[in-house]
Regions:
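DNA-contacting surface of Y-family translesion DNA polymerases
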Residues: 1-91, 101-106, 116
Length: 117
């Protein structure tokens, strides 16, 4: 059973400006939205992964009340998480994932009664 859906990117040159980081997070959020649509999942926990140039890694998560799978619903949270991360070093990798799912692909079982004549 899949526990999360996410995407990440390692950069060939480290990102230092918040503007560049937000541009890359926007691209990652677009990809994440596609993956959530394909997997037919909505989640309540948004996680931001940051790996710095020195390979130190942090993850920051927030769990919200509603299930989301659209960028418009989770990207503001991603931006808030990046602000809380206090970026003080150049960034080597960024990732976004969503977990704590509500499965949208629940199929009702059909029951059929067999009669032996």
């Amino acid at each position: 059973i899949q526990k999360s859906v996410g995407t990440e990117k390692t950069f060939s040159s480290d990102l230092s400006s918040v503007k560049d980081i937000l541009i890359e997070l926007n691209i990652l959020a677009n990809e994440l939205e596609k993956r959530l649509f394909i997997s037919k999942k909505k989640g309540k926990t948004i996680t931001l992964k940051i790996k710095y140039y020195d390979f130190k890694q942090i993850t920051i998560s927030r769990t919200i009340e509603q299930y989301v799978n659209k960028k418009v619903d989770f990207f503001l949270i991603v931006k808030d998480l990046i602000i809380k991360a206090s970026l003080i070093k150049p960034v080597r990798l960024l990732g976004i994932s969503i977990s704590n799912f509500k499965n949208l692909n629940i199929k009702q079982k059909k029951h059929q009664v067999d009669f032996n004549f």
